[in-house]
Structures are given as C-alpha cells and as structure tokens.
Design a protein with these regions (language model features):
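Short acidic, Gly/Ser-rich segments with clustered Asp/Glu that frequently serve as metal-coordination loops
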Residues: 9-13, 171-174, 243-245
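Conserved active-site and cofactor/substrate-binding residues in soluble primary-metabolism enzymes
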Residues: 14, 18, 40, 44, ...
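Active-site histidine-anchored catalytic micro-motif
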Residues: 26-46, 58-133
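Anionic-ligand-binding alpha/beta catalytic cores of soluble enzymes and soluble regulatory domains
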Residues: 108-192
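A conserved acidic, glycine/proline-rich C-terminal tail/linker
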Residues: 177-252
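Residue-level marker for buried hydrophobic side chains located in beta-strands
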Residues: 3-5, 63, 166, 238
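N-terminal glycine-rich anion-binding loop in soluble enzyme alpha/beta folds
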Residues: 1-38
C-alpha cells in the first residue's frame, strides 16, 4: 500500500521516522513516501494533498497528513488537544486522512466523494500523529466499520485563498492559487508582481521556458487537477529561468499574497 505522508516535521526529521515506524505497526505492507511542507503551513499541505490525490494512483493509495497548528482554539488546551482527524475519499480512489486544520482540506473539499470525521480522539499526546492517529488511520484504511464518524460539512472548510503562494518547489518556483485562463493570457505582456515587500517585472507566457535565461515568467506550471464538473484547473507559477523565484522575492512563505499590476 502506497502511503504518502505530508507533514511539517522537516526533511530528515526524526519525527518522520517515528511516524513511519508507528504506521507500519498497523499497516505492515505500507510503502511510505515523505513530503515535507513548511511549519504550520496548511495551505502547502492542502495543495500537495490535491496534487497527489487527484491524479492516477495505485489501488489502495493513502495520504496521511499532519499539519496541526492548534489554532482552532486560542485558549489553553487540556491533554494536548488539537484539531480533529478527518477523512476524504477522492474520485481517483485515493483516501485522505489527516487533521482538519486551516486549508488542509480546502483544495479537495468540492471534489471529494466523501467527507467524514474520523472516530479518533483529538487529544492525548503532544505528538498525536505518532501516538494517536496511526491506529485510527489504519482502521480507516482497512475498512473497519467503526473507524469513521459523522459527515464533515464541506461548507465548514475554508476555500483556498485567492492569488497566494501555495507551494515552493525544490527549484524555487512559486506555485500560486492563480488559475490559468488561456482566454485572458496575452503572451509577451509585461506585468509587475509584488509579494510582501519585493516587486519585480515578469513576462506573461503560456510556458515557463518561453522567456530568456534570467527572466521571470508568469506562466501555467506543472500543477493542476480535474474538478468536479470535469474541467481542469492549472495553476500559475512564477518561474525564474536559471534561478530561484523564491529567493528573488526574499523567500515568501506559502500563503503570502501575490499582487499583479
């Protein structure tokens, strides 16, 4: 069973090893794939969940995610309580299990065939993704009848922010929540892009490499998926050919607003 683990532990962090080990106790045949996202970045986690989950996957694929900033209640929390564990089943057959925090389920809420709460405690450990959730995730993966709770209302999940940085890839390309519309794109047009305190000129194009070396492109990237109505969304990327757009804009965090002029 392919199990994608999307979490904000940090690449190479001991936490990934501990979580993999604990899940494997309950799912011995699991094949883990680790995808780190920045600390507390539910938008990056949500983007990764959709990009992985809404494309063809091996039968039985599971996405287990944990980005839990515990921002659902600002008061002191007894017993290390935090956001609850939730479940989604996608049209691809991929099952998603993880904390319903921030934007974690935002990119899939309107596509999911099923949204349910998991029948799991939301407290009991500072490290719930190791000590509490693996057993619950395994119960869901194995189809145990008592593993799921009530339906989760998609309207209670926030929509993704518009015109924001969603994810930064290893090349420093900035994947955004700006949807590509071929009817509105005029290749070659020069625009000004501002993120936080940094502002740079970019060239609008229909492909990232359609600009000279050293130029910044505003173009449809490699990320996107099929929506409920059968249409396909592709997300705009900021791509610095031969460099890092992330560094150019002073390393903006996922969630940063992208202003276009």
């Amino acid at each position: 069973m392919l199990v994608h683990i999307i979490a904000d532990y940090g690449m190479g962090d001991l936490a990934f090893a501990e979580v993999v080990q604990r899940i494997k106790v309950h799912l011995p045949d699991m094949e883990p794939v680790l995808t780190p996202v920045p600390a507390y970045s539910t938008i990056a986690a949500g983007f990764c969940i959709a990009q992985i989950g809404l494309h063809p996957s091996p039968p039985g694929t599971l996405i287990y995610h944990n980005v839990a900033p515990r921002e659902d209640d600002p008061a002191a929390r007894a017993h290390n309580a935090g956001e609850r564990l939730a479940y989604a089943r996608l049209p691809t057959g991929v099952r998603v299990i993880g904390v319903n925090a921030g934007y974690a389920f935002s990119f899939i809420k309107d596509v999911a065939e099923k949204l349910r709460w998991a029948a799991s405690s939301a407290e009991g450990s500072q490290f719930r993704s190791r000590d509490v959730f693996p057993q619950a995730a395994a119960a869901i993966a194995l189809g145990l009848p008592a593993a799921l709770g009530h339906d989760l209302d998609p309207e209670s999940i926030p929509s993704p922010p518009v015109s924001a940085v969603a994810y930064v890839d290893g090349y420093g390309n900035l994947k955004t929540t700006i949807a590509y519309d071929p009817n509105r794109v005029r290749p070659g047009k020069r625009i000004t892009v501002r993120i936080n305190e940094r502002q740079h000129e970019a060239t609008v194009s229909d492909g990232a490499f359609a600009v000279p070396h050293g130029e910044l492109a505003f173009a449809p990237g490699s990320s996107g998926w099929t929506l409920r109505d059968g249409s396909t969304v592709r997300w705009i990327e900021l791509f610095l050919r031969g460099g890092s757009a992330w560094n150019l804009f002073d390393r903006p965090a996922p969630g940063s607003f992208v202003a276009i002029h």
